[in-house]
């Protein structure tokens, strides 16, 4: 199974905190929200690949985050090419974008990149 983390929003509701920084990379409990999510996913043996879709504005932030990770799952950061709220694809548009770009034809576990949760 593959997993898609949605992180292509422009985080406008948390301005000015997120004006130049993506919401999924804000720290909660000493680490980014997206890292909490990734740690939960590492416990699911069926997940073999993880994609994170973001926009052009925040793409390099996620690349830097990925380069600092110490984990066993490879994450591919995908840039949807959008640069503002005006041309954003939206959640379902980004899902479709990644499915087509990666030719996904198997179950896909989709998670919002700014959602904290517990499986227990």
Residue ranges and their predicted role:
Residues 115-120:
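Acidic donor-binding/catalytic loop of UDP-sugar-dependent glycosyltransferases
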Residues 9, 114:
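Active-site glycine-centered loops adjacent to acidic/histidine catalytic or metal-binding residues
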Residues 2-5, 13, 27, 31-111:
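Conserved N-terminal catalytic core of the sugar/cofactor nucleotidyltransferase
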Residues 19-23:
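Short alpha-helical oligomerization interface
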